[in-house]
Amino acid sequence: MVSPWLCAVWGEGASVTACLLSQILAGRGRTGLAALTSRYDGTPEPLLRALERLNCRSLVVALPETACALDRRADTAVLLSCGMGEAAEWLMRGCDRMVVNLDDPDGVPERDGPVPVWTISERRDEADLTARNLRLLPYRTEFEAVSGTDICRLSVPLPEGLGLYPGLAAAAAALSFGVTLEESARRLHRAEPVPVGMIPLPRCSPFAAAGYFDADGGAGV
């Protein structure tokens, strides 16, 4: 059996970013989400295995900023803020590619890391995915995502600019999975920043949100 594609997200806004990314990827098939809080004890491996048994094609895990390593290598690691956290250091060593926020002071050096790096930024033209024509709305954040010659308007369900970096990071991680900006835009327009519609794992830890999203309609049923 082919192992699911795995994306690990770390840093400020990790849970929201992971939730948005899960709903984007659900357009390609059942996608599992495990969002851990700082009070979660242990690794997310039991949750990921449970989601694998439910035939998830892809898995997204949001790691707390406290130490919490994975027991497997991530296909893509999203570092919203790098710093010196143990989880961030593990991800830099234990992934096949990274998405790094160039607007974070600690993110700039990591673009020259040992694995391919996709960079995001609000204004830096050298980033792989940038934002322009930002609109701050009461209930959404809208901007044009620019990747090379591709331009697509994203509408993220977070108010007053709070959706900028989660939206950019989710779209960049989706690109590494083969999802186009246009497809991400369609999914984000129907997405929620919290796991509304997610079908939860039974007997899950009270310190984690874990379950899966199905392809029909964006999130679960």
What is each PLM-predicted segment?
Residues 2-12, 41-42, 50-56, 62-212:
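Acidic, Mg2+-coordinating active-site environments of NTP-dependent enzymes
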Residues 1-46:
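Walker A (P-loop) phosphate-binding motif
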Residues 18, 163, 217:
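Short, conserved glycine- and acidic-residue-centered signature motifs
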